Amino acid sequence: MNFEKIIAQNKLKTNAVLTTYCVIFAFIGLLVDVIRINANDLGIALFKLITFQIFPTITVIMFLVAFVVIVVCIQNFSSIMLSGDEYKLIDPSKVLSSKENQIHGLLLELLEEAKLNFEPKLYIINAPYMNAFASGWNETNSLIALTSALIERLDRDELKAVIAHELSHIRHNDIRLTMCVGILSNIMLLVANFSVYFFMGNRKNSGANLAKMILLVLQIVLPFLTLILQMYLSRTREYMADSGAAFLMHDSKPMIRALQKISNDYKENDYKEIDTNSTRSAAYLFNAEMFSTHPSIKNRIQSLSRRAL
């Protein structure tokens, strides 16, 4: 199976997960609206709320809050991702070291190969661990960050494959997707938890009581459901980025070697006390946690090895 077909299949999976998120998000808001209007019949109330015969106030507020939070995150996300470490912008208009010139040159080669008309900002993070991540809401404010240890220990092709992987995340809008899903998840959990307690003591009609019971069940189920969906979504995007890197490189071997070196580095060293920025853990090229949003290195390498260019 070629890489373009793999990417297309994973996009379909992503759309299915994102649709599921939006449906659950709206359903929770509608349930709270059913309780708010003290409905006698759950089905009839949901129909009237969905068709705006009754205005779904809580549902609309939830979507507005999500929108505001997303806007705030867009403005500050890159600075949050870079926080906690000393970092340097590779500015081609200034004098660069030979290594910085090489990294910038690799990025330009990939941009030409992919026929892209934008250039992400390139950062070096001064850190002893080997990793990389991409950030930015869209192409115009995107960035790619590489740790100094990664730059020192990978050869030219491996480094280019890592940059290609992060560039693929930007091309596939993965950062935007991850941010939106994370925000929707948190708002869903907050509304499901607090609405149950807020309405618990009030006398309600049968439809409202049924909505309350469903919310009580969701209060237990949602944390596990959102975790599973987020892990599935993120792992799908990682496979896509790996495929995108191999496609741009016309070879999967450099990406495989890079993953092996990074994995071995984390096996030999414990960086938990050094790398304290938890916000960017989901965006890393490699995540060593047991319940990681990333597939295992073994599965990623097997997936890359099976695929034909």
UniProtKB/Swiss-Prot annotation:
Keywords: Cell inner membrane, Cell membrane, Hydrolase, Membrane, Metal-binding, Metalloprotease, Protease, Transmembrane, Transmembrane helix, Zinc
Group of enzyme by EC: hydrolase
Gene3D superfamilies membership: Metalloproteases ('zincins'), catalytic domain (3.30.2010.10)
GO cellular-component term (any): plasma membrane
Disulfide bonds: none
GO MF term set: metalloendopeptidase activity; zinc ion binding
One of the GO biological process terms: proteolysis
Compartment(s): Cell inner membrane
InterPro entries cross-referenced by the UniProt entry: HtpX_protease, Pept_M48_protease_HtpX, Peptidase_M48
Cofactor(s), names only, from the UniProt record: Zn(2+)
Membrane topology, from the record: Multi-pass membrane protein
Bilayer-spanning residue ranges: 15-35, 54-74, 181-201, 213-233
EC number(s) per entry: 3.4.24.-
Cofactor notes: Binds 1 zinc ion per subunit.
Record: active site: 166
Binding site for Zn(2+): 165, 169, 238
Matching PANTHER family: PROTEASE HTPX
Similarity section: Belongs to the peptidase M48B family.
Name of the protein in question: Protease HtpX homolog
Protein source organism: Helicobacter acinonychis (strain Sheeba)
Gene that encodes the chain: htpX
